[in-house]
Amino acid sequence: MENWYWKYDSAINADQCAEIIKMGDNQWHSGKVDTVDGNAEVGTGRSSDIVFLDDRSVYELLEQFALDANDNAGWRYELTAAQPIQLARYRVNEFYDHHLDSIGSHFDPRPRKLSLCVALNDDYDGGKFDFTMSSGLAEEEIATGTVIVFPSFLFHHVTAVTRGVRYSLVGWYTGPPFK
């Protein structure tokens, strides 16, 4: 694979990012991890709070990046739907261990093909978004508004936040099984 991920630096303006963060006010709950058997559980591999957003404008905003990256990166996966968009909050010492998104979801049996992550702020320390590659770790510096799109079968993680609060937006795009 030539392009393991596709990055859009500061593609969403800071005001839009702040508005998205506000959508999570008073709705936060502990993030769960989907397991291989299709269940979701609060586990030791993840420590963060999440909110699933149901705002059409956010779906439309993210979809343009997913479709563009799918084409420009050369993946050209058949995508048929977007799963619920997740707003995540990581406070000091919170993290998300190495994982892949393609295992599936307890609420949608279709395979996840593309994942998308948006940095909604950058006024924190730690909280690095990394890919685990066969060649080693690919660490990305992510400024506010940066969008990263990648195949859902790539291992990735978020390191522990050491100062401040990290906010991100995550989306997944599904389609028929790979052939």
Functional labels for PLM-detected ranges:
Residues 1-147, 153-179:
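Fe(II)/2-oxoglutarate oxygenase catalytic core
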